[in-house]
A protein has these predicted regions:
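Conserved functional hotspots at enzyme active or ligand-binding sites that engage polyanionic ligands
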Residues: 1-118
Length: 118
């Protein structure tokens, strides 16, 4: 299965035990890794989505537009960046539109301590 940056994918979670706010259930995620890495690596860098829309004031929480394939309104948790095996991707659900790509990129820069771009 080909996976590209900014794809919305459904991921099966292989985490052993829930721990606080760590995401560990099967859920959608956004592929953050560049396409060269996506093509050549057995792993992917992703940020998880949640349907629990909370703390929208945080710059690392990006509420998405409606996307076919997502059952509920969703928010990207850019403080929940994870490296997963490509084998954990069940399917590609959709792809972010340009407006949401900009929001996710800004939230990721803030999450990693690089600031925000205009």
């Amino acid at each position: 299965m080909e996976v590209r940056r900014n794809d919305i994918v459904f991921v099966k979670c292989n985490a052993m035990v829930p721990n606080g706010s760590v995401q560990c259930f099967d859920r959608p995620a956004i592929v953050l890794q560049n396409n060269k890495g996506n093509a050549n690596s057995p792993t992917l860098i992703v940020a998880y989505l949640t349907s629990q829309i909370k703390r929208t004031d945080l710059p690392t929480h990006v509420v998405l537009q409606h996307y076919p394939g997502l059952c509920k309104k969703s928010m990207v948790l850019l403080e929940q960046v994870d490296t997963i095996s490509k084998d954990d991707v069940v399917e590609v659900i959709n792809h972010l539109d340009t407006e949401d790509v900009v929001k996710v990129n800004n939230g990721l820069l803030i999450s990693l301590g690089f600031g925000e771009v205009a």
